[in-house]
Curated annotation (Swiss-Prot):
It comes from Leptospira borgpetersenii serovar Hardjo-bovis (strain JB197). It comes from the Bacteria. SUPFAM superfamilies: Actin-like ATPase domain, Heat shock protein 70kD (HSP70), C-terminal subdomain, Heat shock protein 70kD (HSP70), peptide-binding domain. The gene is dnaK. Keywords: ATP-binding, Chaperone, Nucleotide-binding, Phosphoprotein, Stress response. This is Chaperone protein DnaK.
Length: 645
């Protein structure tokens, strides 16, 4: 067996992508539906099925309350931070424990980590199908501006999915890695502008001789393509109410229809000046059914979303300032994320940096490609690349007077370790409470609490005498570890920051076991679907051959074939795999016998009956059904050579 691969996964808000190094080059892997991107959507059906990706998206309108999309906007966050998101989703978001978040469905309650794990399992299976071997290791990307809790939650999702997360890397950094992979001899300063489905990041990097050094990063984890969709949705709801007097925002299935229509309109307005939004039978009143029929122009869309586009300006300016650079110092601006296709976004980028953005990378795939390259570095497949990332936010502790004392400043290269000695604030103080903070504000209360722990057993002494050394250690994943040590006694207390919205080790282990059981059920379900498709293909072929053969076969043979087709269809309805396999063997024999007889008499259709063994065709049928209604467009973003920009 070949050496185990470390795959790269872009776990996106809207879509996810998986890539792997093959023969020294990164390869984006198609999923079982034949698409290179997989919707980050999980659904639970009335039949007890768990659907992931395009299958989940296809049934979202009729099963809105049990279809979870944009889980990434909730991962690692506290319930009080999610009020805006909760207003615009079709499913129910509830409190978990003290401050955590869960999604309530007919199949039970699930954390954002568990939902994300289902998507990661789909990515894992996609890679295993392609490689023909088991995959257990991955590099997973996160927005650069994700805080410690969000990073830890993403890593937990990977564990639940059965993956050993070798590294968490920032999405803009991964994009830069992909862009510069074949430009190792080029020395340049680049800006990566990443506007995805739920988050915005801007990173400034310096590329020199295979070293990718992040100089600064900034962003907004509450801004992305979902917000542009919401702006259109709110406009549709308001316009419809003005026209009819009816508020259509209360019905969950209607909200799901509005969401899909808004997303479609947004995409169309990237290539046309106006779009028609038509939703028949959107609601009804005493006078009868009502239809939504509106025209949205690009000018109106730009007006609705101007504040969202403008929100990306200040992070860009801050990132340039933190890097000690002017816009004119930037050699290339790389655009990442589906939302960068919006013309107003591209125009703003041009205004900020004073140059046309570089469009030589695929904005949907470039992050996963960079993750695969980093996986290649960790696996020893790539040797001439060094990645130096940074921590996006400052870290410190609360000190006397409620002030935040910073130990590690934002944009410090990671991994890093920093210690500082503190003392007691009162005479004979026997314990100190360490309040760990992340943020940029001066007062502790204005920053984010990552955790608290106590160092006890300090010998009685006047205030200011004990020496308490506090050490912050940020690993290569950007995850924080903190320790406090009494230098007088040697007593030490260490913690890995575990958020109030996070998961305990016991909870993670339980979820891992649940996910393993879920994977087994998924495999069984997939085998049943494949058996159905194969048997249905055989039944259809036999039926077609008999109809075309006419009097080339006798009445008894026709009746035998008709009975066998009926038994096959009954087996398909039963969902019993063993019964379907038995029917498949029986119908294959009859099809072969009839085909031989018809062929010997030169009748049409014989070759089809004889050759329809089923498995490949059945798999294709399954894939096609999964792609039903989906517009998979790989070429809507022009890829050009650098010299042809």
């Amino acid at each position: 067996m070949s050496k185990e691969k470390i795959i790269g996964i872009d776990l996106g808000t809207t879509n996810s992508v998986v890539s792997v190094m093959e023969g020294g080059d990164p390869v984006v892997i198609q999923n079982s539906e034949g698409a290179r991107t997989t919707p980050s959507i999980v659904a639970f059906t009335a039949k007890g099925e768990n659907l992931v990706g395009q299958f989940a998206k296809n049934q979202a309108i009729t099963n809105a309350v049990n279809t979870i999309r944009s889980a990434k906007r909730f991962i690692g966050r506290r319930i009080g931070e999610c009020e805006s998101e909760m207003k615009h989703v079709s499913y129910k978001v509830i409190r978990s424990g003290n401050e955590g978040v869960k999604f309530e469905t007919s199949a039970g309650e699930f954390t954002p980590q568990e939902i994300s794990a289902r998507v990661l399992m789909k990515m894992k299976q996609t890679a295993e199908d392609y490689l023909g071997q088991k995959v257990t290791k991955a590099v997973i990307t996160v927005p650069a501006y994700f805080n410690d809790e969000q990073r830890q939650a993403t890593k937990d999702a990977g564990r639940i999915a059965g993956l050993e997360v070798e590294r968490i890397i920032n999405e803009p950094t991964a994009a830069a890695l992909a862009y510069g992979f074949d430009k190792k001899n080029v020395n340049s300063k680049i800006a990566v502008y990443d506007l995805g489905g739920g988050t915005f990041d801007i990173s400034i990097l310096e590329l020199a001789d295979g070293v990718f050094e992040v100089k600064s990063t900034n962003g907004d984890t509450h801004l992305g393509g979902d917000d542009f969709d919401m702006a259109i949705m709110e406009w549709m709801i308001s316009e419809f109410k003005n026209q009819t007097g009816i508020d259509i925002s209360a019905d969950k299935n209607t909200v799901q229809r509005l969401k899909e229509a808004a997303e479609k309109a947004k995409i169309e307005l990237s290539g046309t000046m106006s779009t028609q939004i038509n939703l028949p039978f959107i609601t009804a009143d005493a006078s009868g059914p009502k239809h939504l029929d509106m025209t949205l122009s690009r000018a109106k869309f730009d007006q609705l979303t101007k504040s969202l586009v403008d929100r990306t300006r200040i992070p860009c300016e801050n990132a340039l300032r933190d890097a000690g650079l002017k816009a004119s110092d930037i050699n290339e601006v790389i655009l990442v994320g589906g939302s960068i296709r919006i013309p107003a976004v591209q125009e703003l980028v041009k205004q900020i940096f004073g140059k046309e953005p570089n469009k030589s990378v695929n904005p949907d795939e470039v992050v996963a490609v960079g993750a695969a390259i980093q996986g290649g570095v960790l696996a020893g497949e790539v040797s001439d690349v060094l990645l130096l990332d940074v921590t996006p936010l400052s870290l410190g502790i609360e000190t006397l007077g409620g002030v935040m004392t910073k130990l590690i400043e934002r944009n410090t290269t990671i991994p890093t370790k920093k210690s500082q000695v503190f003392s007691t604030a009162a005479d004979n103080q026997s314990a100190v409470s360490i309040h760990v903070l992340q943020g940029e504000r001066e007062m502790a209360s204005a920053n984010r609490t990552l955790g608290r722990f106590d160092l006890i057993g300090i010998p009685p002494a006047p205030r200011g005498v004990p020496q308490i050394e506090v050490t912050f250690d940020i690993d290569a994943n950007g995850i924080v570890h903190v320790s406090a040590k009494d230098l007088g006694t040697g007593k030490e207390q260490k913690i890995r920051i575990e958020s109030s919205s996070g998961l305990s080790e016991d909870e993670i282990q339980k979820m891992v076991k649940d996910a393993e059981a879920h994977a087994a059920a998924d495999k069984a379900q997939r085998e049943v679907i494949e058996a159905k498709n194969e048997l249905d293909t055989l039944a259809y072929s036999l039926e077609k051959t008999v109809n075309e053969a006419g009097d080339k076969i006798g009445a008894s043979e026709k009746q035998l074939a008709t009975d066998e087709v009926k038994r096959a269809r009954e087996a398909i309805e039963s969902n019993d795999k063993a019964r379907m396999e038995s029917a498949k063997a029986s119908i294959s024999k009859i099809a072969s016998d009839i085909a031989t007889k018809v062929y010997s008499q030169g009748a049409p259709g014989a070759e089809q009956a004889a050759g329809s063994t089923g498995p490949d065709q059945g798999q294709n049928d399954q894939g096609n059904s999964g792609n039903n209604g989906e517009k998979v467009v790989d070429a809507d973003y022009t890829v050009v050579d650098d010299e042809k920009k």
